[in-house]
Amino acid sequence: MPVICVNPSNSSDKEIVDGLSEQNEDLRLFLSDELEDSFKSSLPGKKAIGDILDDTHISTATSGAFCGVFFEDKDAKLRSIFINAIEDSSLKRIIWLSQSDPDEKILNLKNLAYLQHEDYKNLIENVLELESQEEIDFGHKQISKD
């Protein structure tokens, strides 16, 4: 099933994208036009590049994907943009990756698994498992360091 990664923007995000690329033949990316060209070209998958601050760009890019993996920035500036994009999308599964606590608006989104992590520890395994399963448990999951 097609998966789209929204806002991968650092080397740890790239590791997750690389893992998803190995297990999913139809990997898509929505990347900020502010990212370095060398980083954008290092990522696998079909790329859409646009304004990460425009939720309509993101929701349009998710069209046709089954699963969306949203990489939230450390200071959660994109939170409301992601929420609007998800609400306007047809995604059947959303995996939201964040170091911040979720709020009620996020947890009330349908079909959402919220993975809260500390410095990406043990995150990749959890993302790959959730993306590959036919059925998953939705809601908030704290990823421990051990």
What does each model-found stretch correspond to?
Residues 41-46, 108-112:
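A short helix-to-beta-strand connector/capping loop
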Residues 14, 52-55, 76-80:
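Structural motif corresponding to alpha-helix initiation and N-cap regions
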Residues 1-29:
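N-terminal Rossmann NAD(P)H-binding glycine-rich loop of SDR-like oxidoreductase domains
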Residues 42-66:
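Conserved Rossmann-fold cofactor-binding substructure of NAD(P)-dependent oxidoreductases
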Residues 26-30, 34-35, 66-67, 79-121:
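Conserved Rossmann-fold NAD(P)-dependent oxidoreductase catalytic core, especially the SDR/UDP-sugar
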Residues 106-145:
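Conserved beta-loop-beta element that borders a ligand/cofactor-binding pocket
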Residues 72-74, 98-99:
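Conserved NAD(P)H cofactor-binding loop of Rossmann-fold oxidoreductase domains
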